[in-house]
Swiss-Prot record:
PTM entry text: Palmitoylated. In natural infection, inactive HA is matured into HA1 and HA2 outside the cell by one or more trypsin-like, arginine-specific endoprotease secreted by the bronchial epithelial cells. One identified protease that may be involved in this process is secreted in lungs by club cells.
Entry keywords, A to Z: Clathrin- and caveolin-independent endocytosis of virus by host, Clathrin-mediated endocytosis of virus by host, Disulfide bond, Fusion of virus membrane with host endosomal membrane, Fusion of virus membrane with host membrane, Glycoprotein, Hemagglutinin, Host cell membrane, Host membrane, Host-virus interaction, Lipoprotein, Membrane, Palmitate, Signal, Transmembrane, Transmembrane helix, Viral attachment to host cell, Viral envelope protein, Viral penetration into host cytoplasm, Virion, Virus endocytosis by host, Virus entry into host cell
Positions of the record's site feature: Cleavage: 340-341
Sequence ranges on the Cytoplasmic membrane side: 546-561
Glycoprotein found in the keyword field: yes
Keyword Transmembrane belongs to the record: yes
GO molecular function, one term: host cell surface receptor binding
GO CC terms in record: host cell plasma membrane; membrane; viral envelope; virion membrane
Record organism: Influenza A virus (strain A/Duck/Germany/1949 H10N7)
Disulfide bond annotation, renumbered to this chain: 21-477, 59-287, 71-83, 104-147, 291-315, 484-488
UniProt topology in membrane: Single-pass type I membrane protein
Name listed for the protein in its UniProt record: Hemagglutinin
BP GO terms, sorted: clathrin-dependent endocytosis of virus by host cell; fusion of virus membrane with host endosome membrane; fusion of virus membrane with host plasma membrane; viral budding from plasma membrane; virion attachment to host cell
Record Gene3D superfamilies: 3.90.20.10, 3.90.209.20, Hemagglutinin Chain A, Domain 2 (2.10.77.10)
C-alpha cells in the first residue's frame, strides 16, 4: 500500500509541471506551391504572379497619343490623302489600326516592315524641303483619280509625280541633290512609276528608254520602270513602288532620271523614341496603363502575364503558364486535434502547426495552475514578414524591363525572315517560361527555409533563457521545473525571464521528479529491479520455511559425500 501511495503522489507531481510550447501559424486548407525540392509543398499563404486579366481598351490618361485611324504609318511619310492630319507632330504613343491605308495609287513599299517599325518606335516626325527644281519642260503636278483630295484628282502630299509638260515629249535628263545639313539622320523616300502600257509611258515620258539612279555614300541603286498591264486597283493598272534610305548628317543623296521618278518633295526626321501600338481597342482617357497589346491594356503589378508574347511598354514578361504561385507564408502543417492525456491538448511545432493563431506567424501556448493561454511572438513574426514583404516587388524588378515587340505582318519577300523572327520569339518565350518557373521555385524554397529558420531561432531563444530550469520534450515544448504563473510565462515570451530567480526551486523539483519519470529509458531499469526484488523476496520466504521445518524436525536434510 505504501508503494502505491508514493507512485501516485509522484505522478501527481509530474502532472503538476507547468509547460510552455512554441508553435507556428497553420490553416485548415493551405495552398500548394512548387519549390526546388518539392513539386507540391503546402504553405499557409501564396499569391499569384501571372496576370490573366485584360482590359479591352487603351488606357490613355496622361498620355500624348496620336490615333492614326485609317492612316498607315508609311502614309505619314509619303502623304497619302487619308494621312493629311498626321504628316507631322509629336507623341508618346502612336496607335495604328487594322486595315489602315498606306497607298492610294497601287504599289508597294520595299522593306515596308522595317520602315513601319522605325515610325512606330519614334516619338515624332518633322519635315524638311528637298529644294529640288525642275526645267520648264517638266511638270511636277502629276495627279491621279486614285488619290482624291477635296473631291478632285490629287497625289501624295510629300512626293512629286514628274511628267513631260507636253504629251509625248521626251522627258529631259534631270539631276537633283539633297544635302543633310542637320545633326540627325533624315529619312528620304521616293517612288518608281511602272506604266500600265507603252502608250501611257510614251504619253508621260516620251519614247526613250527610262532609267533612274539614286546614289549616296551609303546607298547606290539603278531602277528601270517595267511597262505592263496589271490587275486594276483603285481604277489603275500601273504601279508605283516606293524605296527609302537614311541620309546621314553631312551626306548627299543624288537623283538622276529621264522619266519615271516619283521625286521626294520633303524628307522626314524621326525624333525621340516612344510607344507604337497595333490595336483595335477603343481609347479610354479615364484610365492609365504602362503596358499595351493588340487586345488592349495590361494593368497589373505582377511580374508575369500569359495574355500575349507581343506587347509594348513596361510590361510583365510573357510566360506560357496559367499560374505560378509565389509563397508568402510558411510551410503549412494542419493542426492535429490532441486527446487530453497527461499534459492536455497542448503540443509544439514539431508535431503540427496551430490553427486560429491569426495575430502572428509564431507564438506560444502555455499551461500552468492558472489555466492555459496563447500569445503571438511579434518579433519573430516581423522578422519573417520583413523578408517576405517586397518579395513580389523584387521579383518584378528582376523580370520587368521596358520591352517592345511589335507584331509584324510580313510580305511574301519577307516571309522567311518572318519565320525566323517568330521562331526566335517562340524560343524566347520557352526560355522565359522556364526561367520564371525556376525563379518562383527558388523564391518559394527560400521563403519556406527562412520561415523554418525563424521558428528554430525562437525555440533556441527560449531554450537559452530556461537553461536547467526546464526540460525539452522533443516536440517543441518545455516542461518547467518550477511554478511559472502567467507573469512568469510573459517574461519567457518577451525575453526577460530571470533564470537565477527560479534556480533553487527548479533544482529541487528536478531531483524529486526525475527519479520516477517513466520515460522509455528508465522504464526498463525499473522493471528489471522490480523483477530482481521479487525474486529475492520469494527466495527469502522459501529459505525461511526450510529452516523452520528443519528446526522443528518436520524436515530432514541428508548430505551424502
Amino acid at each position: 500500500m505504501y508503494k502505491v501511495v508514493v507512485i501516485i503522489a509522484l505522478l501527481g507531481a509530474v502532472k503538476g509541471l507547468d509547460r510552455i510550447c512554441l508553435g507556428h501559424h497553420a490553416v485548415a486548407n493551405g495552398t500548394i506551391v512548387k519549390t526546388l525540392t518539392n513539386e507540391q509543398e503546402e504553405v499557409t499563404n501564396a499569391t499569384e504572379t501571372v496576370e490573366s486579366t485584360n482590359l479591352n481598351k487603351l488606357c490613355m490618361k496622361g498620355r500624348s497619343y496620336k490615333d492614326l485611324g485609317n492612316c498607315h504609318p508609311v502614309g505619314m511619310l509619303i502623304g497619302t490623302p487619308v494621312c493629311d492630319p498626321h504628316l507631322t507632330g509629336t507623341w508618346d504613343t502612336l496607335i495604328e489600326r487594322e486595315n489602315a491605308i498606306a497607298h492610294c495609287y497601287p504599289g508597294a513599299t520595299i522593306n515596308e516592315e522595317a520602315l513601319r517599325q522605325k515610325i512606330m518606335e519614334s516619338g515624332g516626325i518633322s519635315k524638311m524641303s528637298t529644294g529640288f527644281t525642275y526645267g520648264s519642260s517638266i511638270t511636277s503636278a502629276g495627279t491621279t483619280k486614285a488619290c482624291m483630295r477635296n473631291g478632285g484628282d490629287s497625289f501624295y502630299a510629300e512626293l512629286k509625280w514628274l511628267v513631260s509638260k507636253t504629251k509625248g515629249q521626251n522627258f529631259p535628263q534631270t539631276t537633283n541633290t539633297y544635302r543633310n545639313t542637320d545633326t540627325a539622320e533624315h529619312l528620304i523616300i521616293w517612288g518608281i512609276h511602272h506604266p500600265s502600257s507603252t502608250q501611257e509611258k510614251n504619253d508621260l515620258y516620251g519614247t526613250q528608254s527610262l532609267s533612274i539612279s539614286v546614289e549616296s555614300s551609303t546607298y547606290q541603286n539603278n531602277f528601270v520602270p517595267v511597262v505592263g498591264a496589271r490587275p486594276q486597283v483603285n481604277g489603275q493598272s500601273g504601279r508605283i513602288d516606293f524605296h527609302w534610305t537614311l541620309v546621314q548628317p553631312g551626306d548627299n543623296i543624288t537623283f538622276s532620271d529621264n522619266g519615271g521618278l516619283i521625286a521626294p518633295s520633303r524628307v522626314s526626321k524621326l525624333t525621340g523614341r516612344d510607344l507604337g501600338i497595333q490595336s483595335e481597342a477603343l481609347i479610354d482617357n479615364s484610365c492609365e496603363s504602362k503596358c499595351f497589346w493588340r487586345g488592349g491594356s495590361i494593368n497589373t503589378k505582377l511580374p508575369f502575364q500569359n495574355l500575349s508574347p507581343r506587347t509594348v511598354g513596361q510590361c510583365p514578361k510573357y510566360v506560357n503558364q496559367r499560374s505560378l504561385l509565389l509563397a508568402t507564408g510558411m510551410r503549412n502543417v494542419p493542426e492535429v486535434v490532441q486527446g487530453r492525456g497527461l499534459f492536455g491538448a497542448i503540443a509544439g511545432f514539431i508535431e503540427n502547426g496551430w490553427e486560429g493563431m491569426v495575430d502572428g506567424w509564431y507564438g506560444f501556448r502555455h499551461q500552468n495552475a492558472q489555466g492555459t493561454g496563447q500569445a503571438a511572438d511579434y518579433k519573430s513574426t516581423q522578422a519573417a514578414i520583413d523578408q517576405i514583404t517586397g518579395k513580389l516587388n523584387r521579383l518584378i524588378e528582376k523580370t520587368n524591363t521596358e520591352f517592345e515587340s511589335i507584331e509584324s505582318e510580313f510580305s511574301e519577300t519577307e516571309h522567311q525572315i518572318g519565320n525566323v523572327i517568330n521562331w526566335t520569339k517562340d524560343s524566347i518565350t520557352d526560355i522565359w517560361t522556364y526561367n520564371a518557373e525556376l525563379l518562383v521555385a527558388m523564391e518559394n524554397q527560400h521563403t519556406i527555409d527562412m520561415a523554418d529558420s525563424e521558428m528554430l531561432n525562437l525555440y533556441e531563444r527560449v531554450r537559452k533563457q530556461l537553461r536547467q530550469n526546464a526540460e525539452e520534450d522533443g516536440k517543441g515544448c518545455f516542461e518547467i521545473y518550477h511554478t511559472c504563473d502567467d507573469s512568469c510565462m510573459e517574461s519567457i515570451r518577451n525575453n526577460t525571464y530571470d533564470h537565477s530567480q527560479y534556480r533553487e526551486e527548479a533544482l529541487l523539483n528536478r531531483l524529486n521528479i526525475n527519479p520516477v519519470k517513466l520515460s522509455s529509458g528508465y522504464k526498463d531499469i525499473i522493471l528489471w529491479f522490480s523483477f530482481g526484488e521479487s525474486c529475492f523476496v520469494l527466495l527469502a520466504v522459501v529459505m525461511g520455511l526450510v529452516f523452520f521445518c528443519l528446526k522443528n524436525g518436520n524436515m530432514r536434510c541428508t548430505i551424502c559425500i
